[in-house]
Amino acid sequence: MSCTGKTVFRGAEVGEFRCEILGVLENTGPKQSVILARLSGGPLEETGVMQGMSGSPVYVGGRLVGAVAYSFPFSKAPIAGIRPIEEMLAPAPPRQARSAATDPFDLAASLPARQEIEMGTSRLVEISTPLWLSGFTRGAIERFAPRLRAAGLEPVQGAGGGRTRPPAGSPPPLQPGEMISVQLMTGDMSVGADGTVTHVDGRRVYAFGHRFLGAGETEMPFARAEVLALLPSLNTSFKISNAREWLGSITADNATVVAGELNRKARMLPVRIRVANAAPPRQTSSYSMEMVGDRLLTPILVQMAVFSALEATQRIAGISTITLRGKMLVRGGEPLPLSNMYAAELGTPNLVSAAVAAPVAALLQSGFDSLRLAGLELDLEVSNQKRQLQLDGVWSSKRTVRPGESVDITALFLGESGAELTRKATYHVPVGAPPGPLYFTVTDGPSANLSEFRQFLLTPPRSPEQLRAFLTKLRPNDRPYLRVWRSSPTLQVQGENLPLLPPSAGAALLQSAAQQSNSLVAEIRMDPAPWLFSGSRTIQVEVKE
């Protein structure tokens, strides 16, 4: 059976190609089928099925039957799988809310598996979505490309990416076969994902013929795109494209379709990154972007943007220390501060970018409407010195102490080139303190945060207040911390510590799902310094009656 299809081969003009339906693959998924067809005409004999063709409409006798959605990698013939239009237009089945991934940056583990159909030694797979990135360093793209490819996205460095530009005069109505670019980030760095429009019904737009991320209900702007050139490849050819004028917002990203609405504005998050050199002359580079507020995609975009900004303005190999000062803007509430220092001989930008993206992921994946991320502001200062001190020793002024008395704890830190620094803290043993061993641990910020991180993973915050408290209490490592504790257990229920419970209540909770940990008696923040403190040591002092 003969059929025709529509797609863009050059510029913004929709061209036609021919096809021959070979048959129908039934039950390739739950109530899903795939129409198998051989494509021909235009450049397809040379290029085969291209990335960016996803969603190209196919007609039989003038009737829309489906959209190009599948291809055979490394195939010598342009054979495609066509998604039936009925599956694209059907209401999406109810979806369970996406849960946070164990690794918030592992897109592939967090998303539904992409559909593959085994056919002997070949595979019919969903056409990968080309992800155009502009304004990013080559190193940033190479570092994050494996994660993106695992999620079915093909990162491509280009000039167009997610930038949009207004057309000359009034733009024409959007037509089936035209190319669109889903705008994930715009500005000094930009990201756009390309596909083709299958069907337009009033203000509703249906495209791709398969999922983009499988996000379900979503909010992502999209623009018209133009094709600059076609690049044939033995693996999968693709269209080199440019984003043009804004058109509307993608509102649904389901297994069989990416659907949106024309003239609908999508909410975007403003992101500002400023990178300064600590040594004179103090040069500063600033980056301003807007990005989507997706709970899984945004942390990766933030990580890529921070890494690229650091790599573009500073060397990433060799010793460096990076100081972070910033804040996460929250809709209708006080900003959440970001403050820390990072030092390493290699890979400091990777440490910083991951550290920034982690609280962004926690905020976006919490699901609390009163803590919706509204923007991100980051100031990064880079030094070519390793300003790091290692804990060398801890001692106390007394071996034994009585209730009502004080004990001094001193810590010695050593660094490169003979750097030496001491920090002292005084703990007052309260009247009525029970006898027995009392432990004093001098530690760095990340080590002190471990117990909170464990609690966060075991019992995620049950309220916006708990999440805000968790994020604001994270300790920076520009100072050491003195933690005073006993070995008797304390209890945690729904993320809250319950110290000093009556024996009957404690016994009941010990038999429930409550979490147990050592009893933290006090924590003292020791004096800060423009250094990164690292290391942890514990000493014991005996409390006598």
Language-model region placement:
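Terminal presequence/propeptide segments associated with secretion/organelle targeting
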Residues: 1-545
